[in-house]
């Protein structure tokens, strides 16, 4: 296993104007970025970064800073597969030459970090790429963008960093991997940490959810404890349906059966046959009830995979005209999946969950939660309830979104797919 340094050392080095290396999850980019605080940018630091990286230097910024400086998205519909929020490139208006030299880019970086800067201090386009970090940092999105802003803030500096991916010296056509990054860090006296470590540190020292209420809820699947939460950054309410003891005198929080369910008014409440959401929720509650211990976390704000109820209804119109669920979203200028699992991960941790068996057919959901320090020991498939109205939707989820759904090609209306729950479960 690769030796890593402490988050405390990385924060101290950032505060002292040094660079650090941050590695993300192996199921994500699986790359190491060189990171330093933008307000500490010097020609020497920038030259070092250019020499050992791809050279595509970016400056992650807090969202409020982006708004103050008028940094608009580079493209109206973000199609980056990791959701990196690129904005229009900039140069400092004064004090630079062409904008590309290490000295010029250091000047632009420091200006972006300066709380006194205004939009008119920059020319567009330029040679530095500002990135908009998610509010909540790595707890909301486990990316290098958020890691850079978090590290700067934790060091007591302005919420602005500088990042770029380190290139492999073994194979210059690819990015450096973990073992090579450790060697590089030791050669140059740099701290090496992971985003997972940063998430764990922030989770231990900060809290971004509030437990508000708890009540007994009898359901047709048995009795649950409904625990209500609000997310501090978004003021969105979420509910965890809990069965049995998750963590306590007789339980250690391990091996918990968990369903993280995205809100779906049409499917969960109205019983729409256009999706399988309602049947998945019912199946998850039944499976947790049968086990006698587990959590069904109902995530508000996830309607239509995060695009909202009214947009979802608009996509239904497009689907009736021939588009599939992915193309309908894209045609409206919306992402195929805009959901964020960071708050859900914090709720699970607050409930005492340490390791889980995750009820899902969506491998991406596993990746979305795994980066938050929650150990997923097994992905438990949910039964598929197909019908004539949702069969195309299910096939699209399988073929274009990577969902693990079997038996769809053999479907016809008179036959239930294997594993389908009946009402007696």
UniProtKB/Swiss-Prot annotation:
Alphabetical list of Pfam families matching this protein: DHBP_synthase, GTP_cyclohydro2
Swiss-Prot/TrEMBL cofactor(s): Mg(2+); Mn(2+); Zn(2+)
Signal recorded as keyword: no
Record-listed D-ribulose 5-phosphate binding positions: 28-29, 33, 141-145, 165
Residues that coordinate or bind Mg(2+) 1: 29
Biological pathway: Cofactor biosynthesis; riboflavin biosynthesis; 2-hydroxy-3-oxobutyl phosphate from D-ribulose 5-phosphate: step 1/1; Cofactor biosynthesis; riboflavin biosynthesis; 5-amino-6-(D-ribitylamino)uracil from GTP: step 1/4
Positions bound to GTP: 259-263, 280, 303-305, 325, 360, 365
GO cellular component, one term: cytosol
InterPro entries according to UniProt: DHBP_synth_RibB-like_a/b_dom, DHBP_synthase_RibB, GTP_cyclohydro_II, RibA, RibA-like_sf, Riboflavin_synth_RibBA
Residues annotated as site: Essential for DHBP synthase activity: 127, 165
Sequence positions that bind Mg(2+) 2: 29, 144
GTP-binding in keyword set: yes
Family: In the N-terminal section; belongs to the DHBP synthase family. In the C-terminal section; belongs to the GTP cyclohydrolase II family.
Name by which UniProt lists this protein: Riboflavin biosynthesis protein RibBA
Organism name: Mycobacterium ulcerans (strain Agy99)
Protein's gene: ribBA
């Amino acid at each position: 296993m690769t030796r890593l340094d402490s988050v405390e050392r990385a924060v101290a080095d950032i505060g002292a104007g040094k660079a650090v290396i941050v590695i993300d999850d192996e199921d994500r980019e699986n790359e190491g970025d060189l990171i330093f605080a933008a307000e500490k940018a010097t020609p020497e630091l920038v030259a070092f970064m250019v020499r050992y990286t791809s050279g595509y230097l970016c400056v992650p910024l807090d969202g409020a800073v982006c708004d103050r400086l008028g940094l608009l998205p580079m493209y109206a519909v973000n199609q980056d597969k990791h959701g990196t929020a690129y904005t229009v490139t900039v140069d400092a208006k004064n004090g630079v030459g062409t904008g590309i030299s290490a000295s010029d880019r250091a000047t632009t970086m420091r200006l972006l970090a300066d709380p006194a800067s205004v939009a008119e201090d920059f020319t567009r386009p330029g040679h530095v790429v500002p990135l908009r970090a998610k509010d909540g940092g790595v707890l909301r999105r486990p990316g290098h963008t958020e890691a850079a802003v978090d590290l700067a803030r934790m060091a007591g500096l302005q919420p602005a960093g500088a990042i770029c991916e380190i290139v492999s010296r073994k194979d210059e056509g690819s990015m450096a991997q973990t073992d090579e990054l450790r060697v590089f860090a030791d050669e140059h006296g740099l701290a090496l940490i992971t985003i997972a470590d940063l998430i764990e540190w922030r989770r231990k020292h900060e809290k971004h959810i509030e437990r508000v209420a708890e009540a007994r809820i009898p359901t047709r699947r048995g009795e649950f404890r409904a625990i209500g939460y609000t997310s501090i950054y978004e003021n969105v309410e979420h509910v965890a349906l809990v069965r049995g003891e998750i963590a306590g005198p007789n339980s250690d929080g391990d091996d918990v059966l968990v369903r993280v369910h995205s809100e779906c008014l049409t499917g969960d409440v109205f019983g729409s046959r256009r999706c399988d959401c309602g049947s998945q929720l019912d199946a998850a509650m039944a499976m947790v009830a049968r086990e006698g211990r587990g959590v069904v976390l109902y995530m508000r704000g996830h309607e239509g995979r995060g695009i909202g109820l009214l947009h979802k209804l608009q996509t239904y119109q497009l689907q009736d005209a021939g588009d599939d669920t992915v193309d309908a979203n894209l045609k409206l200028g919306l992402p195929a999946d805009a959901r964020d699992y960071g708050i859900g991960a914090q709720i699970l941790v607050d409930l005492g969950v340490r390791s889980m068996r995750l009820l899902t057919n969506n491998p991406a959901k596993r990746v979305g939660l795994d980066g938050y320090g929650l150990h997923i020991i097994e992905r438990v498939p949910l039964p598929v309830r197909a019908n004539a109205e949702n069969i195309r939707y299910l096939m699209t989820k399988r073929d274009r979104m990577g969902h693990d759904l079997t038996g769809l090609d053999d479907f016809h209306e008179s036959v239930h797919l294997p594993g389908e729950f009946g009402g007696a479960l």
